[in-house]
């Protein structure tokens, strides 16, 4: 009688690449959808946080967004994407609810053929794209944790696993 050990492989998040994001935006006709997608990809905020944003949460001068009552009822400050233009403020608050925004995202991802290159892509993949780009560009994981609003660093560490090139680069620099 032996003991069987089960090994669980954790699925890595599905992240949108910069090319995928550009492809998505090119096929997005509604400005409020473009703004929502830009905020997800450029600031790493969740779909619910995008839908809850108010004009006074965005500080154009300091290029910051105050995310109020994020997951776990926590407030945090995140960067305003460089591509965010003053006229985009007219779209805040976003004119649709979470479900409608996710549906629009899926529809545009299909039309833009993004679903063909990244199967099962969804709005949250924008946030994963933000996080994986941050890690690829050398952002310390504890800074990323703060921006994403994670209470546990192990939640953020998954983005390190998505970037094996970073580990290889660190190895090459050491040896």
Q: What are these language model-derived features?
A:
Residues 40-62, 109:
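Short, charged phosphate-coordinating catalytic segments
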Residues 49-50, 121-122, 131, 138-152, ...:
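Active-site-proximal segment of tyrosine recombinases
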Residues 1-23, 68, 92:
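Flexible interdomain linker/hinge and immediately adjacent N-terminus
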Residues 14-47:
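Basic, Lys/Arg- and aromatic-enriched nucleic-acid-binding interface segment
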Residues 52-85:
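Conserved tyrosine-mediated DNA breakage-rejoining catalytic core shared by Y-recombinases
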Residues 69-72, 148, 153-173:
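Catalytic-site neighborhood detector that most strongly recognizes the C-terminal catalytic loop/helix
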Residues 81-118, 124, 130:
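Active-site/catalytic core of tyrosine-dependent DNA strand-transfer enzymes
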Residues 1-6, 44-48, 103, 107-108:
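N-terminal DNA-binding recognition helix of tyrosine site-specific recombinases/integrases
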């Amino acid at each position: 009688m032996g003991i069987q050990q089960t090994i669980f492989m954790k699925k890595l998040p599905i992240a949108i690449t910069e090319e995928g994001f550009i492809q998505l935006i090119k096929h997005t006709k509604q400005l409020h959808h473009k703004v929502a997608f830009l905020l997800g990809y450029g600031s790493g905020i969740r779909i619910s946080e995008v839908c809850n944003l108010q004009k006074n949460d965005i500080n154009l001068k300091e290029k910051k967004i105050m995310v109020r009552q994020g997951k776990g009822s926590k407030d945090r400050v995140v960067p305003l994407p460089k591509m965010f233009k003053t006229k985009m403020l007219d779209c805040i608050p976003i004119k649709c609810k979470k479900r409608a925004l996710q549906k629009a995202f899926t529809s545009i991802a299909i039309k833009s053929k993004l679903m063909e290159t990244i199967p099962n892509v969804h709005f949250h993949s924008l946030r994963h794209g933000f996080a994986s780009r941050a890690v690829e560009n050398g952002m310390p994981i504890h800074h990323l944790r703060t921006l994403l609003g994670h209470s546990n660093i192990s939640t953020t560490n998954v983005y390190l696993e998505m970037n094996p090139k970073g580990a290889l680069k660190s190895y090459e620099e050491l040896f």
